[in-house]
Amino acid sequence: MSPNCIVYLSKDVKVPAKWNNIVYNGVAEKIVLTADEAKPFYCPKKFKAKKIMYTHDFKQITGQGESAGWETIVLPFNVQKVIHEDGRILAPFNSEIKNAKPFWLRALTKKGFENVTSLNANTPYIIAMPNNGAYEEQYCVNGKVVFEAEDNINGVDILETPNEIKSEGPSFLLTGTYNAILSNSTIYLINKNDNSNGFKAGSVFIRGLRDVDPFECFVSPNGLSTKSII
């Protein structure tokens, strides 16, 4: 079974207790999603999860006074906590979360990409984890990062997957997807882990660069010419 598959069951159907992603009568004990294997996610019917988590491996080098190390992200839940695999608490810059190590998070607005302090459900973002030899080691984030939310009493709302997940900018759209999309000439993908074309990895959106993975976002023109630089 795909690691990001959600299974809906009635209470009279028994499955091993160690299984995740099982929804009984509208409630899931634990939902575990991952970027590994680039498997899709789809929620056909809303439910509540007592705990939900998504794991992503960040490896890129970020810039120092220049754009680099960016990638995109979209998640199906409002993120409450971000944790590095070594236990460090992470949070977007200016979040004012005590003892958290900061990372960059930006949403697309009519004015362009702007810094934000929360990662909300079904909203496309660009994201970068500080990772550069010039930074203090305590601020470098390299490896697996878990985005999670938890509510054992009322549950975390997981809504039906929208038909479209878009934010509109001054001349282009940023669209999130939970499915893989084949590369084509109408969409621009960020050059994650790709130093070719004369640009540093994670610095530009390039047309037809590669396939889109689930939980990623892509740029498309909005009636005007699209510039590739973040």
What are these regions (language model features)?
Residues 91-95:
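Intrinsically disordered, low-complexity transcriptional regulatory regions
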Residues 99-114:
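Short linear interaction motifs
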Residues 96-98, 195:
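Polar low-complexity intrinsically disordered regions
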Residues 1-12:
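Structural signature of tandem-repeat unit edges
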